[in-house]
Amino acid sequence: MLDKLSQNYPKCSVFYKKLNDSQFFLGATPELIMKKTNNNLQTNALAGSKPVENKNELLNDSKIINEHDIVVKGIIDNLNSFNLKPNLDSKNILELKNIAHIITKINSQINDRHNPLDILDSLIPTAALSGYPKKESLKIIDSIENYERGRYAGPIGWIDQNMNCEFYAAIRTAYINKNKLYFYGGAGIIINSKAEEEWNEIEKKIKAIKNIINE
């Protein structure tokens, strides 16, 4: 199953975690939260989606650009709180098998005074997974969602003895609990969002793992 996910989604980070003998958590996520290599810190803003066949419309859609810019602003706010000076690449398109996203790569230089785990903690969840401003959005989520998100959208990755690390958001996932199977995916909702379009987007996102499990 993991081999198939890797083959079908080579631009995603594929993960699998056995929680116990009857519970498993797996997925294929394109969303890099943070990667530290020596003094370089990279994080990606990934927000704004269309079916892959309509990918060329992404950078000309004002609603999608607005959605993406909100996520960029949230990340910049977090990095600025550590007195970092983030540099933004130009908006680009990340093309996956059945869906495409706008991606902006953001790089910063850090030093030994910066604990990357503190930066990671500030970055999660990004505005794509919570909202903006984050503190107010999380309060609203707590008040209206009547279920726990569990491990969905949490950080998954690695860190070494030199504090180099790489973490992704655990999105587009499946949770297996005995004889029950749960799929997790989401979409960014802003003022001009249309419910049916957002639902269709979620369906496309979870299709990545759903189809492989059903094979």
Show where each model-derived region lies.
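Contiguous alpha-helical scaffold segments within structured protein domains
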Residues: Q42-S143, N211-N214
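An anion-binding catalytic pocket shared by soluble metabolic enzymes
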Residues: M1-N66, I70, M163-G186
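A glycine-rich phosphate-binding loop feature that marks nucleotide/adenosyl-phosphate handling sites
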Residues: K18-F25, I75-I76, K91-N98, P155-I159
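Conserved hydrophobic core element of enzyme catalytic domains
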Residues: K105-E215
